[in-house]
From Swiss-Prot:
GO biological process, one term: proteolysis involved in protein catabolic process
Chain positions recorded as Na(+) binding sites: G162, C165, T168
Name of the featured protein: ATP-dependent protease subunit HslV
InterPro entries linked to this entry: ATP-dep_Prtase_HsIV_su (IPR022281), Ntn_hydrolases_N (IPR029055), Proteasome_sua/b (IPR001353), Proteasome_suB-type (IPR023333)
EC number: 3.4.25.2
Keywords: Allosteric enzyme, Cytoplasm, Hydrolase, Metal-binding, Protease, Sodium, Stress response, Threonine protease
The keyword Hydrolase appears for this protein: yes
Catalytic residues of the enzyme: T7
Species the sequence originates in: Aromatoleum aromaticum (strain DSM 19018 / LMG 30748 / EbN1)
GO molecular-function terms, A-Z: metal ion binding; threonine-type endopeptidase activity
Function: Protease subunit of a proteasome-like degradation complex believed to be a general protein degrading machinery.
Amino acid sequence: MEQYHGTTILSVRRGRRVALGGDGQVTLGNVVIKATARKVRPIYQGRILAGFAGGTADAFTLFERFEAKLEKHQGNVLRSAVELAKDWRTDRMLRRLEAMLAVADPDNSLVITGNGDVLEPEQGIVAIGSGGAYAQSAARALLENTALPPEEIVKKSLQIAGDLCIYTNQSHVIEVLEG
């Protein structure tokens, strides 16, 4: 059976201000199933932002596991991500999950990959999903050449990705944290 997939998730930071946004499209094969899905949300008492790309059910499983790690490690994003990655590599069920998480707090921006890797991308930009490369390119240009706040960069970059990627739409959810 085909999985629900296709999205763009983007996080941009300037200093300790970080925005994380995503589009709302969910597809099953070549059919749009939902246009207003919420794939980005604040977690851990609103102090951390998280977004997912990949299989929806798989992503919710990862969200739950990551939130449990955050509780265990008092909201330490990096430690929680590393501990989740360790579980991911050793747990048979987790290894079968087809999803990625983008997480950010005022100090860290991370990608937790489907291989159980934890990556801290350069330049404060995290982009995952089918439209991630388009959004990342736009965000990098805007971050380097304008004084726009992170949420505006995320908004404009998601719009560009939605114009180019057939699995990304123009229904956006953008969350912001101020450090």
